Amino acid sequence: MEIIENFLPEEQFKKIEDRVFGPNFPWYFQDGIVTTGDGNFKLTHLLYAHGNVNSDEFNLFRPVYEKFDMLSILKIKLNCIPKIETVRENGMHKDVDTNVDFTTAILYMNTNNGYTRFETGEKIMSERNKLIVFDGKIKHCGTTNSCDAHRRVLVNLNFIEDK
């Protein structure tokens, strides 16, 4: 696992941050955090999946995905999990169901008391402009947050590396 603090230069990160946290960024309701109907909900914005750009916002995130040597992108998605009373872990999962080796990267858009936990037991706190990179076949789970941040927002990238 690799952890990179201050992943993007401040000016680049701020441009993305201002748009994502602005009043007109399009978020879409998902009935479930890990699986449909799991009793929770989140808002998402799918930038890229199944070989297609799915959003006019895709190019805004170019400074993020261009930092990787990718053979192909599998999926890029933003997650927005609203604040609740207590921090709750969601189910362990892999982001993409595939037999090929792939990499997952998570860019935390804001600091809050949520985190990502791995099946290995490691726990990475959500901190603004921090990126974690790991083997996509490692199961992990995200959480809610219960601090003064009204939401936990992250960018989730899944891709095949050009090795």
PLM regions and their residue ranges:
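A short beta-strand-loop-beta hairpin characteristic of the jelly-roll/cupin
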Residues: 86-92, 99-102, 108-127
